Regions:
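Short hydrophobic alpha-helices and adjacent helix-cap/hinge residues
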Residues: 1-165
Length: 165
């Protein structure tokens, strides 16, 4: 890896893996993808304008702290464009997004605290195993679904960990 900070390089790799997984699933389902890039709030308007030009049926927002930071604006633009949106954070759904399949943040933070405790007690970070989150939650915003005219199947509602009325 060359150029950029280590954390930005890791984010780039994580994003590439997310995209690869989405592309593979889209191929299996016969869904045409349109890639849009938004690195900050200034890019959101143009990205949503592109979804309108391309007549997108829905939007998948990948997990990024940028998108978490601008969750209210993303929800607003999605509603304005009448675009059902799948997000990566529970907070984004609470801000008005349609749905998310997201890491349970309380579980994630608790797990991170265990790592910090081990390091503070003398463990070398390089010796600790890399672990992925294992608990995910489905969150659905019925108020947003109604406003968009999207019917959420009863089976999906029953599987949801949280339904926002």
């Amino acid at each position: 890896m060359s150029g950029g900070s280590r954390s930005s390089q890791i984010r780039s790799i994580r994003f590439a893996l997310q995209v690869k997984g989405v592309e593979a699933t889209a191929r299996v389902l016969g869904i045409r993808l349109q890639h849009l890039e938004a690195r900050g709030s200034d890019d959101l308007e143009s990205a949503f304008s592109a979804t309108a030009r391309e007549r997108a049926d829905a939007l998948l927002v990948t997990g990024s702290s940028t998108f978490l930071t601008h969750r209210a604006r993303i929800a607003e633009l999605a509603m304005k464009g009448r675009l059902p949106t799948m997000l990566s954070f529970r907070e984004s759904v609470a801000a008005g997004g349609l749905m998310a399949y997201a890491v349970n943040m309380a579980d994630f933070v608790q797990h991170a605290a265990v790592y910090v405790e081990k390091i503070l007690k003398g463990a070398k970070p390089a010796d600790l195993p890399v672990e992925q989150p294992t608990k995910f939650e489905l969150i659905i915003n019925l108020k947003t679904a109604k406003a968009l005219g999207v019917a959420i199947p009863q089976l999906l509602l029953l599987r949801a960990n949280e339904v926002i009325q």
